[in-house]
Amino acid sequence: MADHPRFGPAGVPPAFRATKASLADVPRLLREEGLDAFEYQAVRWGSKPQIKREDAGKLGLKAKENDVWLSLHGSYFINFCGDKDIVEASKQRLIACATAAEWMNAYVVVFHPGFYGKRSQTEAFRNCVEALREVVGAMGTLGIKNVKIGPETMGKPSQFGSLGEILGLCEEVEQTQPVIDWAHLHARDKGRFKMVDDFREVVAETENRLGVEAVKNMHCHFTRVEFTDKGERCHHTMDEANYGPDFAMLARVTAEFKLNPVIISESPALDVDAIKMRDTLQRELKS
């Protein structure tokens, strides 16, 4: 459980790569920027971890030394709403991600549940619950007890991942926690976050359905986003103020509810915008 709001990037920032920093260097470099979270990107993985156990352990050790919380973004090639063979392959990919998360002491594996395809929302939900229960059961067999699985709210209406669906999954399946991607919700609902109350509603619904601890320690993604009638198109930086949502509104709600979320920047300016979000919240907490 976080003792304060934490901020960090989704993946290794370009400036770090430019210096040829190793993965194990990332926590120290983030700490030097005043950031304290990092979401490792495993988005192209298959059915086996694509990181050596030794390297994952080294990342976890350096993260602990620098008080940087780790999460892991799972494979994009997961679809629990697909045909049987697709679902089976998806389960193996998610288990591989959970295995690596355990090695590096990441506390949550974020993943996209899938696309409705020809299935009804009810059938898609039932399939996701069944598959996710089997994944969590397999994790238990493997001794993976300290990693939660985090289904993410999604940015297109063709994708399984409305706020209600994600909260519903977490009500039905143990060892899960919701991942609230504010930009995805904004795009999915065609500009949902216009006022502070729009953010309050998400926080209140999450608390009502999953409890105080679930909302107090939310794992979140944030960026400004461009969208069309089909949902999310692309991410924008915090300086591109003609795109929403407005982080200042979320900062106000975070301070008001005394939340301690982990907020991962998915902006094109990964760590730069994570710092801007952190500073915005700090100003709000002091006001």
Regions found by a protein language model. Name each.
Residues V135-E232:
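Acidic/histidine-rich catalytic cores of soluble enzymes
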Residues M1-T99, S287:
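N-terminal pre-domain/capping segments
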Residues L30, F38, H73, A101, ...:
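Conserved, mostly hydrophobic/aromatic
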Residues E201-V212, D239-E256:
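A short, acidic, amphipathic alpha-helical segment used as a generic capping/interface helix at domain edges
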Residues K64-E65, F80-I180:
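Active-site acidic/histidine proton-transfer and metal-coordination neighborhood
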Residues A18-S22, Q50-K58, G82-R93, R119-A131, ...:
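Alpha-helix N-cap and loop-to-helix initiation/capping positions
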Residues A2, V26-G34, Q50-S71, I95-N105, ...:
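Acidic (Asp/Glu)-rich catalytic clusters
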Residues A10-A15, Q41-W45, S75-F77, G114-Y116, ...:
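Active-site beta-loop-alpha junctions enriched in small/polar residues
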